[in-house]
């Protein structure tokens, strides 16, 4: 408590910066000899004049905040709010971007293949790429990778609390269902398994989620209702690339309807998407069946709303990017992006560090169906260069036409946004292949990208410390510890007896919709087109 004399008055300032009188006060004007940064002129008041004293205290508090660079804002229903000039600038910028997004969302979703939006970089497109990238990152942040956990391979959070548990309280989306896949013999290094003898499932892994934007977000931020599908990929281990058979097979071999048997996809991706294990309650439906039934249900619910349009956005990183492309193709091929009244719902794919998925004919079929794909890549990342190291879209068109029947002739789909981590002053210029593949780093690169040859300048205030959440990518002088994200007590909690245990996590009602059989029967997936 600091005592400050002023003539016959003694005012005290406590640790909360409030001011109280501790002696009689006269009615003369006086100067309080604070240090320069605290100096104010005030009027001594009668100790019985509590309302006047309160007014002085409020004025002093207001002046203190103004000296700190805080500005007052009137908030409807919330009184006065104090914000820095930078806070107000960012708020106004966000408000303007949301207005623009409502007006231009079809272009941002790729209606014109993002013509004129990538160089220079459109700020709305950048914000949306970061936002959907964070939805893909949420799959990593929620996933239990720990083999010492009996819940290894699951989401650490329930469906209804998913975004709130991750601190994404302003996401504006609600998770409609979780996605699971069965362990695939072709990709053994992709799945995480517990070392416990008794586990939640021996063959399944949590793969992501389907979410839908809420009413307020749809109306005030997005300009439409959005169905978002996020696929989990791989955080650091890239051994799954070596597992790829580098073998293309027709999608029709896995009962995906397609009028052209020449449309082919890498066999490992295709099997992961369509395989199921009828003995496991989490994977008794394939990932494909889970996706298609949920999209069908949501389109039936929202597809013909009179007051809003509808979009479908699929996102994923790494192998999750491959599954995002494959599932978006399937949705369009099954014509699930059509409402009951025949309205066409745009389907957009946003991938980050994703591999090639299919052959040239697969790419052409995606274009025929109108599926828009944007691929964000780090030019130093090896994953987007696989599979199809030798025969791919970079070869002459004539050569690709000759070789397109070969089972190892691949082609990327859609538009590519190429970023370079060596342009960021925050990141180490030389790193290993898994670090160059890091999703948080790609979101950081997006935040600073303004166009080819433009200086790297962060634009949104997104914290660069997130890059080191699961990597050692930031330069040492920034003093951000590597791999800093960890769960409190590794998920252990105390029970009523005072013992430390792993909290019960799985609730079956979070996983499979009760009407999945109804929608499956209507889809008739086992019947040829």
UniProtKB/Swiss-Prot annotation:
Q: Which InterPro entries match?
A: AB_hydrolase_fold, Fungal_lipase-type
Q: Where is this motif: GXSXG?
A: 316-320
Q: Where is the active site?
A: 318, 381, 437
- So what does this thing catalyse? 1,2-dihexadecanoyl-sn-glycero-3-phosphocholine + H2O = 2-hexadecanoyl-sn-glycero-3-phosphocholine + hexadecanoate + H(+); a 1,2-diacyl-3-O-(beta-D-galactosyl)-sn-glycerol + H2O = an acyl-3-O-(beta-D-galactosyl)-sn-glycerol + a fatty acid + H(+); a 1,2-diacyl-3-O-[alpha-D-galactosyl-(1->6)-beta-D-galactosyl]-sn-glycerol + H2O = acyl-3-O-[alpha-D-galactosyl-(1->6)-beta-D-galactosyl]-sn-glycerol + a fatty acid + H(+); a triacylglycerol + H2O = a diacylglycerol + a fatty acid + H(+)
The entry's localization annotation reads: Plastid, Chloroplast
Q: Which UniProt keywords apply?
A: Chloroplast, Hydrolase, Lipid degradation, Lipid metabolism, Plastid, Transit peptide
Function comment: Acylhydrolase with broad specificity. Catalyzes the hydrolysis of phosphatidylcholine at the sn-1 position. Possesses moderate activity toward phosphatidylcholine (PC), monogalactosyldiacylglycerol (MGDG), digalactosyldiacylglycerol (DGDG) and triacylglycerol (TAG).
Q: How does it assemble?
A: Interacts with SBP1.
Q: What is this protein called?
A: Phospholipase A1-Igamma2, chloroplastic
Query: What is the native source organism of this protein?
Result: Arabidopsis thaliana
